Amino acid sequence: MIDQEYILLIMNCKKYEKKSLFQKMTWLKKIPSYLKYYHVIGDTAMETEYEFDNENNVLKVRVADDYNSLPKKVIASYIAVNNTFNYKYIFKTDDDQILVNNQYFDLLCNLIKVKEPKTHYGGFIVDVKQPYMSEYHRIHPELPKQLPLYITKYCSGRFYFLSSEAVQYLILKRANIEREFLEDYAIGFNLSRTLKESILLISTNKYFTDIELSDFPKLVEEGKI
């Protein structure tokens, strides 16, 4: 096992490789040295369940590389980290996010270290007070139109973190998570109440912005990335 206290997993896919390249060109160059990151992509043709490419900061997992398989990709990547590293926390974000505050991870890690009781989960909290049908298929037409969300609290997929204890609990819920379509909801819904008692609220919109609001579209159009 490799000692690595903090690991950042960025959900990516081959189709959007340019987004990962732009992230590497910009904010990922400035993250703290104590933070190891991987872009996570799926590949059903793999012979093994997962493979770390440390030279290119890529984690490949044996799942489909499409949007509907995102819950499968996420839990597979957590299993890969759990089997490979001695870690304290996993941070998760997406390939369409840009970090706009270079002090973010220092601030967050310092806060996590001193928080009592220990926090196992954090991010921008979505509080589902009544069951409802998701309208997310209007943004991602590949999603089912009948997609119920039940009463729970979960952290938005833009960015959230999980302790090693939370990850190990979620691994036991892998089958349940893989049946879902919305990754962030699947994680929060399947995490135990005990591990959600001290969720750390983070105003992630103050620290992250969408990649489409950056120079990324212009650089793609100009063929510079």
Task: Give residue ranges: language-model regions.
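Loop/turn elements at helix/coil->beta-strand transitions in domains of secreted/extracellular proteins
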Residues: D3-Y6, P32-K36, N86-K88, E116-Y121, ...
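Short coil/turn segments at secondary-structure boundaries
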Residues: S20-K24, E51-N54, K72-I75, Q103-D106, ...
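Conserved catalytic core of nucleotide-sugar-dependent glycosyltransferases
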Residues: P71, T93, Q97-F189, R193-T194, ...
